[in-house]
């Protein structure tokens, strides 16, 4: 029995991302430092290994609440408060995920509907998540400005796409370019986004 015709039709819109294709192509080359997928260039630190072992020895290996371990969410809340002066309630405003892709997948699944548009400064690698939920990607070409999204380009894309835009993904440091934004650049983008009802 072939059940493939019963799969989500949006799966046909998804291709393996270019960064994954590139990573697969170079992964067999000896001595290559693979920074393609945001992998660190170091192994797990000893204190992290020891903490994981201690947690297992203490039988802390069962399911947590669906938002993640409260102590971890409290630590995350304190971290962003100290570092960025952003204040979130650990109890109901922070969700622990295993990485950025899971976090984006959960978020985009919650906010997007078929017909919605997500603006994505290119190059980037999150198109499959967006397409899976039936939304569309509109890439913003950033090559002219060393892969930095400018407020002018963002404003132009928001106006061109109109009310269809549901979200803008700002991923930095960005794979595959390594670009990062200054505080001033982010404030300029925030100034544009404040005028629109987008995530």
Each language-model region and where it sits:
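N-terminal small-domain helix-loop-helix segment of the aminotransferase-like
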Residues: 12-99, 106
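Conserved PLP-anchoring active-site segment centered on the Schiff-base-forming lysine
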Residues: 110-129
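Short beta->alpha connector loops at strand-helix junctions that form conserved
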Residues: 121-122, 139-144
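Generic N-terminal amphipathic, Lys/Arg-enriched alpha-helix
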Residues: 1-10
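Active-site phosphate-binding strand-loop segment of PLP-dependent enzymes
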Residues: 142-199
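A short helix-loop-beta submotif of the ANL/AMP-binding
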Residues: 132-137
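Conserved coil-to-alpha-helix start sites within the AMP-binding
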Residues: 100-104, 123-126
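Anion (oxyanion) recognition and catalysis
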Residues: 27, 131, 194
């Amino acid at each position: 029995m072939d059940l493939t015709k019963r799969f989500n039709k949006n799966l046909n819109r998804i291709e393996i991302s270019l960064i994954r294709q590139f990573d697969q192509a170079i992964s067999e080359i000896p001595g290559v430092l693979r920074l393609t997928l945001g992998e660190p260039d170091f192994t797990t630190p000893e204190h992290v290994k020891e903490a994981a072992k201690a947690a297992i020895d203490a039988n802390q290996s069962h399911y947590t609440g669906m938002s993640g371990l409260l102590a971890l969410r409290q630590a995350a809340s304190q971290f962003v408060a100290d570092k960025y002066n952003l204040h979130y309630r650990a109890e109901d405003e922070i969700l622990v995920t295993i990485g950025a892709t899971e976090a984006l997948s959960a978020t985009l699944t919650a906010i997007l509907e078929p017909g919605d548009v997500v603006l994505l400064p290119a190059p980037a690698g999150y198109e499959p998540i967006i397409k899976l939920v039936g939304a569309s990607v509109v890439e913003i070409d950033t090559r002219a400005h060393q892969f930095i999204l400018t407020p002018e380009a963002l404003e132009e894309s928001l106006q061109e796409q109109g009310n269809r835009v549901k979200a803008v993904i700002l991923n930095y440091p960005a794979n595959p370019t390594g670009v990062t934004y200054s505080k001033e650049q982010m404030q300029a983008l925030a100034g544009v986004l404040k005028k629109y009802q987008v995530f």
